[in-house]
Amino acid sequence: MAGKSTPMMEQYLALKAEASAGGDDCLLFYRMGDFFELFFEDAKVASGILDIALTARGKDSGEPVPMCGVPVHSAEGYLARLIKAGQRVAIAEQVETPEEAKARARREGKPVSKVLVKRDIVRFVTAGTLTEEALLEPRRANVLAAVCEVRGTLGIAHCDISTGRMELEECAPDAMDAALARLGASEVVAPENWDGAPADATLRPPSEFASDEGEARLKAIHDVATLDGFGDFSRAMLAAAGGLIGYLDHAGRGTLPFLLPPVVARGEAKLAMDAATRSSLEILVSQQDARSGSLIAAVDRCVTGAGARQLAEDLAAPLTEREPIERRLALVHFFHADPLLRADLREVMRAVPDLARALGRIVAGRGSPRDLGQIRDGLAEARRIRDYLASKPDRPALLDDLLPAMGGHGALVDHLQRALVPAPPTAREQGGYIAAGFDAALDELRDVSGNARRAIAALETRYRGETGIERLKIKHNGVLGYFIEVPAKHADALMAPDSGFTHRQTMAGAVRFNSLQLHEEASRISEAGGRALAAEEAHFEELVATVGDAREAIARTADALARIDVAAGLAERAAEGDWCKPAITDERVLDIVGGRHPVVEAALKQAGDRFVPNDCTLSGSDRLWLIGGPNMGGKSTFLRQNALIVLLAQAGSYVPASTATIGLVDRLFSRVGASDNLARGRSTFMVEMVETAAILAQASDRSFVILDEVGRGTSTYDGLALAWAVVEAVHETIQCRCLFATHYHELARLAETCDSLSLHHVRAREWKGDLVLLHELAEGPADRSYGLAVAKLAGVPAPVVKRARSVLEKLEKGREETGGLAAGLGELPLFAAALEERPEKIGDSMREKLAALDIDALSPREALDLLYALKTEASQTED
């Protein structure tokens, strides 16, 4: 920047340079009184995102300096929008008052009039470091992850600083994308010199990712001499932990958030799914990047935010071991079997505040009296819930394991109940949150203040009588304090030297005064109020410390409540949808009777329609189903619904089916649908091949694979050849359970050579080009794809469909005669000629159909289908 700057602007530029040191690209919120101001390019960026006015302040090099600002009291909402837009924000606060700045100037012998209040960056606000309630989604965890590679092993450390949970894990470098997709991290941190860093990672100095540094930091945080009591951590895990804690230290400017002792995340005990599978199955977000339309939206019946976050974690990382799955299922069954118990419990749970996040804010030094009140109320409700559930017979083992964590806080709850008012405020600056009777000295100070206020009210009455001014009032504001206000027309009476009043301020329609008595009472209020605020602040710090001492026990209580909420919510969902408890087995089977797609079924139900259930039975002797049939017939839905049923079962949930036996799956793969990844130069076909290659390389005989339309997007013969080879590889080499949907009828010949492959199709009917989709799965190969009928159903003009039918007939004739698809095309008339249609005699056609019918042989369903087809044909005739 050229040209002379004001001291304020020099301070701003110095802070901006500090905020941007190390390559950090962030906006600077610069505190000026009651506003956070932004200047230069920051102002342009923020004003565009926030849709606020862009103004100017002063000049730089002869040009106005762009500026915008947001009020401090509502800054959280603006911060949330900036973070959602992908920005990072440095907060520069005033770290001294104007009075302290003036006193400093006097000590330094500098002019008081030119002194500048000190400001410093107190915090960096980023997507992964949020703790404020207004900035977080109640039903979604906010995960920060750090990744690095140590001697060929990838270390991952991740935490949610709003709750303090921290886990360390390791995996092969090529599994990084799948691991990060499972975590759904809001922000990822990586060493800046690492070629393997994720493209969108926040890069940090490599020195922070040293295993020795990570070990030392963890020991210091938890005040232990060894980490052996927490788990067996590898060097890669500790290196990632060092990077994570180093970034948190940087973001908090030396103040670390609340972190629970780290635990080892056992990746091998979780159902492995890559990013493509998660996207395809729409587990936590839909293809439109929204919660609506996702699996969790269809399943979530939790009544607390903590429960919803736990459910999301369960769905993102289902289990692969039978015993813990069955423990979860037993807890769901306990609540499912007793509707009255479930209803009572859920009603009580609705009153449970978010203990984990309130605790996180308190321990991080950003807590409020309201957070303390939430700790008090949450622990009290936990005690009630524990006592209620403990009185029930036949409790499952998991519930008995959870109940002890929900008690033991009696002394803390009693202390908080005595100390706090029933509904503590969010802000503590005005006081009023310590309950009467908790501190006699504080009560006395409040009495002094209250007596002075009553004296001021009496003064107002007295002054009205003495002056005869009925509209005389004693008011208060933050600038003048207490003052006497009268209408301007009565001001002369109070201006007299012997009136006892002192002029303070003249307004447009009123004049303000002071008096000796008012000054004395105001001083008493101010002095007593200041001392009362100091006393409340001291009590607040003591309460925060007391809660902090119990933080690990409170966190365990929060986890137990969340787990119970998840189980009760899943039981509620099962009761709503007539879901069944799945049987879990170690055998390589998948036996689902009456299976439904949970998301599609919910959408159809909302529209007043019904989902058609289907069975799926895979075993060692019949482990690969080849499924044909028309588009829109339900093939993709059938594939996905079975994958989701497996996922739900291994997450510990009931499933949408009449009965279900689930053989444990170690890896779940879905290659259903694709979209062009133009940003990375990948076409639909390339994406399909990359995903298929990953499946062939990573699937085991215990995996479950769903594949849809492999080979589309290239020439017919290339696609058919690829699909053929993939089916053979899955059947002969991998030997896993697999559903394979295709339009290649030629693949049906594989049933002759693949002993464990069977043919299936989705049923459909066609009458004179009108397609009726039954959405039912049947055994045997599909006789045709009904592509032209689907095209007509989609609204393709009739002449085009007719032309396509002519081309199809010639193609099929050529293949029969010469084996070549293109043979016979030369006999086709020109396209324009083919479009010249003569009106079809629909009446004759309908008579022919009716004459050929064997009415006694029609089932009720077939008769109804025929009636609809004839009605459609008649409507087209009228058009």
From Swiss-Prot:
Keywords: ATP-binding, DNA damage, DNA repair, DNA-binding, Nucleotide-binding
Any one GO BP annotation for this protein: mismatch repair
Residue sites binding ATP per the record: G629, P630, N631, M632, G633, G634, K635, S636
Keyword DNA repair listed: yes
GO cellular component: cytosol
Superkingdom, taxonomy of origin: Bacteria
Name of a matching Pfam family: MutS_III
Keyword Glycoprotein tagged: no
PROSITE patterns: DNA_MISMATCH_REPAIR_2
Residues forming coiled coils: none
Annotated Gene3D superfamilies: 1.10.1420.10, 6.10.140.430, DNA repair protein MutS, domain I, MutS, connector domain, P-loop containing nucleotide triphosphate hydrolases
Alphabetized GO MF terms: ATP binding; ATP-dependent DNA damage sensor activity; damaged DNA binding; mismatched DNA binding
HAMAP family, alphabetized: MutS
Record's function text: This protein is involved in the repair of mismatches in DNA. It is possible that it carries out the mismatch recognition step. This protein has a weak ATPase activity.
Family as reported in the entry's similarity comment: Belongs to the DNA mismatch repair MutS family.
Protein name: DNA mismatch repair protein MutS
Source species of the chain: Erythrobacter litoralis (strain HTCC2594)
